[in-house]
Amino acid sequence: MRDKMCPHKSELKAASPLFLNRIKTGILPRMNTSQFTLVLDQIESLIRKSCAFLKGDLDEDQIELYSLSFSQAELLAARTVLASSEKNPNLSNIANYFAADVITSITQKFAVRPKTFGLHASELPDLESVQDFLSPAYISALGQHFLDNGLPESDVDEDKRIIRDTFRTFAEEVVMPLAEDIHRKDLLVPDEILEPLKQMGVFGLSIPERFGGLKPDTQEDSMGMVVVTEELSRGSLGAAGSLITRPEIMARALMEGGTEEQQAKWLPAIASGDTLCAVSVTEPNTGSDVASVALRAIKTSGGWLLNGGKTWCTYAGAASALLVLARTDKDIKPAHKGLSLFIVEKPAYKAVSYTHLTLPTIY
């Protein structure tokens, strides 16, 4: 009965005997990149077919289109990792595992409800060729290999290696000793972390050089930010790794839609760290669903009046500028349109207060 319902054999089994024997002899099996690429090509054609079937109706097919978008991102990641392993053979084992995981993940999304994607179960890839790389035996052997030999070097240039080593040292020597108290005692991010990061130019990683940042004026380069974020997050995601996210979001918003006057005022201040910023999107009753944003922005004689509630605004206290998402047109359809971003200036303060409420018992 199971085979009739699911003829593509999506369930994973134990590794094959030959595969297991190779692992037991200390050899980590590998599959040729071209073999993975064939399966990834097959999956990409299914994604394209599904997109054509759904016709891009974001409201009607929101769940399916989100799944397809996520799958396309996974697919690109798998191709990128496999391409890196061609240049750096030390990455091949983990690339095999990652590609097998992506192939299985996407296939199983389709397998649950193929008809809603405009597919038939018989079109889905047979996972027999990749399932060995997801077996417990292979994963355990891969983990032991890394414990014994260390992780392979990532595929970055010499400049990025220097950046990585610098921020790894900072994370280990500065962030890690402070991280436990910050988390356990709900402390604010201290100046011992913020000030050195300002001096190292961290807040300008997404800002072009002409505005005092570190990003080249002539090309997009996010790899430096990725490397720094990864290393700071090793020390603490909350106390260091996520510090870069807010200035990046505000900088990109300013570069995309800000006036020249706004760019000249805000970008140098953000790049230097003189202006810490926060992003205010999430609302109490709707989370971060932009189609449901209710905070209103109404044009007045003196500018704009923002009226509504926001919550979970990281670094809101220490920030002197908030990037606020507000609804400027309540009648436009679809609902994810009619929104604008506002930069709201505020006094920066380093204080936290809590009000404890005793609520009546509700049955």
Task: Tell where the protein language model's regions lie, with residue ranges.
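Amphipathic, small/basic residue-rich leader segments at the start of a protein or domain
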Residues: I23-D61, L65-S69, A83-E86, L119-S242, ...
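Charged, glycine-rich active-site and insertion segments that engage polyanionic ligands
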Residues: S92-F110
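N-terminal glycine-rich flavin-associated loop
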Residues: L237-E261, G287
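A short, Trp-centered hydrophobic/proline-enriched beta-strand micro-motif
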Residues: G273-V281
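A short core secondary-structure module
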Residues: G303, N307-S353
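Single conserved hydrophobic/aromatic residue that forms the stacking wall/gate
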Residues: H356-Y363
